[in-house]
Regions:
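Active-site Tyr-X1-5-Lys
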Residues: 1-20, 39-50
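Short linear sequence motifs
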Residues: 3-5, 16, 22, 60, ...
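Flexible, glycine-rich beta-alpha linker
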Residues: 15-39, 63-64
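C-terminal substrate-binding subdomain of Rossmann-fold SDR/epimerase-dehydratase oxidoreductases
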Residues: 40, 46-177
């Protein structure tokens, strides 16, 4: 509302964007602040690289989300910034998946079977999806990268990060022994 007020009252050039679960390579993937796609990619990569197929999922895994790949987000931001539209826009995808489905997709990408272990933990809201009607109507923007393709790109990068981290930890253990 403040941005709209400053636009209407003082002529400020403003843009308002609600981002919906943006993910991709080079994002936070470890440490507890990562989004679900990165956390799942990390857990599946650890399962693959250590041979332990168990993957922890907070809650029952039936909470739903939509996820937007970073390259689609960047294109959306460019379109928004180049427009003169100053009202709120959602930027995300409208494909809803459960966390359990997300684990299955990433496990398929990794080429492994996992055992889902549902544990108590923060789950957030039960369901959240991006309504892209307005951004589609106003700017003609649609995400172009499928969830599977975005997760494949993300998984490859995160698996490499996990491999490097495991190698560092292994070398520290052998040095201290």
């Amino acid at each position: 509302r403040l941005c709209i007020h400053y636009h209407d009252e003082y002529g400020f050039n403003t843009r308002i964007v609600r981002f919906h679960n943006i993910y991709g390579p080079l994002g936070t993937w470890d440490g507890g602040r990562e989004k679900a796609p990165a956390a799942i990619c990390r857990k599946v990569a650890i399962a693959k690289l250590t041979g332990n197929p168990e993957v922890e999922i907070w809650g029952d895994g039936e909470q739903t989300r939509s996820f937007c790949y970073i390259d689609d987000c960047v294109v959306g931001i460019q379109k928004i910034m180049m427009s003169d539209y100053h009202l709120p826009l959602n930027l995300g995808t409208d494909r809803l998946v459960t966390i359990n489905q997300l684990v299955d997709i990433v496990a398929d990408i990794a080429g492994i079977k996992v055992i889902k272990k549902h544990v108590p933990g923060p789950q957030g809201v039960r369901g959240r999806n991006s309504d892209n009607t307005r951004i589609r109507q106003v700017l003609g923007w649609e995400p172009q990268i499928s969830l599977e393709e975005g997760l494949r790109r993300t998984y490859e990068w995160i698996e490499d990060q996990v491999r490097q981290k495991l190698a560092r930890e292994s070398s520290k253990l052998s040095v201290s022994s």
